[in-house]
Amino acid sequence: MSRFKRGGKAPDPLSGFRAPKEQESAVPFGLIKAARKSGQLNLSARGLTEVPVSVWRINVDTPPEAHQNVDFGGSDRWWEQTDLTKLILASNKLQALSEDISLLPALVVLDIHDNQIASLPCAIRELTNLQKLNISHNKIKQLPNELQHLQNLKSFLLQHNQLEELPDSIGHLSILEELDVSNNCLRSVSSSVGQLTGLVKFNLSSNKLTALPTEIGKMKNLRQLDCTSNLLENVPASVAGMESLEQLYLRQNKLTYLPELPFLTKLKELHVGNNQIQTLGPEHLQNLSSLSVLELRYNKLKVLPKEISLLKGLERLDLSNNDIGSLPDTLGSLPNLKSLQLDGNPLRGIRRDILNKGTQELLKYLKGRVQTPDMTTQEAANPPDTAMTLPSDSVINAHAIMTLKTLEYCEKQASLIPEAVFNAAASSPITTVNFSKNQLTEVPARIVEMKDSVYDVNLGFNKISSISLNLCMLLKLTHLDMRNNALASLPPEMEALTRLQSIILSFNRFKHFPDVLYTIPNLETILISSNQIGSIDPIQLKKMTKLSTLDLQNNDLLQIPPALGNCESLRALHLEGNPFRNPRATILAKGTVAILEYLRSRIPT
């Protein structure tokens, strides 16, 4: 007869070694049993607040089935268990790890990411076989020096913690290949990282770094360095010696100039957007023979050098939201360029419709714009048969009219456009008219004859004092250049130009911002610098939802209304050279984003 009462339970021989019952129930016996065979245990997302003792002692204690199965001929050979090499405890509610972790010396992979752990146990030094350690998304503020004993560690993920420093002992992880310390509170990086000569991937993004150690240049095997979203004002020259580097991310810092990278012949991607870089010179480009991606958005570049053509392998170039006014023709010679981003630049001289057609059409346009060698004296004296000669000895290029659909009569100092010019274009659907740099006092009346086809008109550098109704009938017009004239107002009839995307009115006589511009729905660019404008209407400007570039430099603006900060579509706002006191020059120097943020902060609440 049994000595236990009917329905009673035998005493548990492992009592005192088990975790609380609710934690043990979260780890089914079958999982532990399977882990002894496979050497792998995944306990992620089980709501654990602590790790059951049975997990730490999985390879120490005799399993319960040993007391039930003594058949050495059975298939379930509990004594042939495998050491635990992989333990995943991710996405639980753990606040600490037990020192009993030392009972798992065979661990190769330990993943405890997405918990609430504030520190690591000193016993982690016993995990000398560990190759991958993921402690990301926790609350760790400091790393123990015991980590230096993990001499086989290859991948160390620490992102999204609260680290304020990396210990010098980090340099002892001699075969480390991947180190991610992004999204912490690091203000500096120990010079000992220079000892990590086997590192391939180093992520320092989203910290508070103001400088990088010179020793970082010793990482000769590093392929990817990410320093995005820090406070870096410069990059150590030693970076130029990281000869294996393929990807360099320096976005969202405080860089005012690009580092010279003469030896980075393997560099494929350079990301330096959202900085304060003002110049890009040939010294920055001449040795980057493998570069395929160059990202320079949201900087203060005014000039793109012709040496950009040195980057023969370039596939993507992002120059959006800079201060670039023109593009070098050599840009058209890049054979592999597939994506060119230019939004938010005050570009002049290139029709908006060409920009809208995409990268390939723009490159084709630039390539076709390359200057041919000057004609010899004999060629000039005997123009080719493809030209039509007017009585004034001026030449109209018939090829341009027939093939490029362009009618040019510029730089002639003419007060009138000869009738023969219009007659030559009578049978062609002209899309572009250029009568700039003459002495015209009014818009030529016969321009209306092209109303069904023309979308780009350049009448800049003349003496025109008013816009005629004939010009207002060019309903397909997308680009209008009236710079350097004598205009003081625009007619309300211009509201009919609903397709107009870009207008240049700089160097005229405007004392008021033309009201009619507020009514043109597709305007993206307004360049109206160097006039005498005294005020603007931010409410009306906010309604211009496509307006991305507004140049109001060198006017008479005594104040900038805070509500202008609500014009969220603006990507390039230029206000320099006006007599207002605020925003101050230091704010203006930071660029459009900073200006708009400042203005919004001044809106009364």
Curated annotation (Swiss-Prot):
Assigned keywords, A-Z: Leucine-rich repeat, Repeat
Gene3D superfamilies with a match to the protein in the record: Ribonuclease Inhibitor
Keyword set includes Repeat: yes
Residue stretches of each LRR repeat: 83-104, 106-127, 129-151, 152-173, 175-196, 198-219, 221-242, 244-265, 266-287, 290-311, 313-335, 336-357, 429-450, 453-475, 476-497, 499-520, 522-543, 546-567, 569-590
Cellular-component GO terms for this entry: cytoplasm
InterPro entries referenced in this protein's UniProt entry, alphabetically: Leu-rich_rpt, Leu-rich_rpt_typical-subtyp, LRR_dom_sf, LRR_domain-containing
Organism of this sequence: Xenopus laevis (African clawed frog)
Name of the protein in question: Leucine-rich repeat-containing protein 40
Region (Disordered): 1-21
